[in-house]
Structure formats: structure tokens, C-alpha cells
A protein has these predicted regions:
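Retroelement reverse transcriptase polymerase core
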Residues: 1-153
Length: 153
């Protein structure tokens, strides 16, 4: 974070009645998975909403624009796919990783969790896991994946 930042407390996006149950259920699902945790009011509050996907599931989105303005990003060099393919050429084995919700495998420290607070008309939640939408999330995730897979090269 940049020095001397001021917290941001935004207004909750309105949720149409037709989508309220679906949105609440997705919030509950993410709480059960340990991604979100219900919290009392805080200095930070970022509006969130869901979008409906073609497969009838929903995707949870948070507006981290105000947080991203206050972040100092530490870029991680993401390797080109052509480099990775050259490295595995001639390998005996290959595999695929299912990284659905991959960012959510990385725990946030308590200070980051306090900033990653989201608000709905019915309450506030804090992210306990790395959310999609934070400017540094791809760098953090790629760094963690590189560390975890380092010995497989």
C-alpha cells in the first residue's frame, strides 16, 4: 500500500429481488469454502455483485478500483507459453492442473483481509483468500505457483 492511505467505504450495489437469493447463496458458498467471512462494519467497504454465466452458475465480482489506486504493485515476471513448451519438450509425462478458483487457494494476511472488505445491502464480508480483481493478484498467484512447481522443472 502507498503511505498514508485513507480507507474507502463505498455504497452497496443494489441487488434486484430476482437475484437476491442467488447472490446470498453464492456469498454463503464462498463463506463455507473459507474465501469470505461475515464481518461487522469496517473502515473499508467495496461494492460487490454477481454475474450469471452461460452454464447457469454465477461469478462473484468485487469492485477493487479504490483499493487498486492505493496499491503499489510488485510485478512478477510471467513466463511466455512458448518458453514453457520448449522446457517440457521431450518430457515423458505431462499433466494438467485444474486451477478453478486458483487465487482462492492463497490465504490473505489479516491486514490485507481488513482492506479486502466487500459490502452488500445485507452486510459486509472480508476476503480471507486472494480475490480476483486486486491489481497484484496475478503477480502473487504466479509467484506462488512458480514456488510450488519449482522442483518439477
Amino acid at each position: 500500500m502507498k503511505e498514508k492511505i485513507s480507507p474507502y467505504f463505498g455504497q452497496a450495489f443494489p441487488v434486484p429481488k430476482i437475484h437476491k437469493d442467488t447472490t446470498m447463496k453464492e456469498g454463503e458458498r464462498l463463506c463455507k469454502l473459507g474465501v469470505l467471512e461475515r464481518q461487522p462494519a469496517s473502515e473499508w467497504a467495496l461494492p460487490s455483485f454477481i454475474i450469471h454465466k452461460k452454464d447457469k452458475t454465477v461469478h462473484f465480482l468485487s469492485d477493487f478500483w479504490e483499493v487498486n489506486k492505493r496499491l503499489v504493485r510488485t510485478p512478477f515476471p510471467i513466463r511466455k507459453i512458448s518458453t514453457v513448451l520448449q522446457e517440457i519438450e521431450g518430457s515423458s509425462y505431462a499433466t494438467a492442473l485444474d486451477l478453478n478458483m486458483g487465487y482462492h487457494t492463497i490465504r490473505l494476511d489479516p491486514d490485507a483481509s481488513k482492506i479486502c472488505m466487500v459490502i452488500f445491502p445485507w452486510g459486509e464480508y472480508s476476503y480471507k483468500r486472494l480475490p480476483v480483481g486486486i491489481a497484484g493478484s496475478p503477480d502473487i498467484f504466479q509467484g506462488e505457483m512458480s514456488e510450488q512447481l519449482r522442483e518439477l522443472n
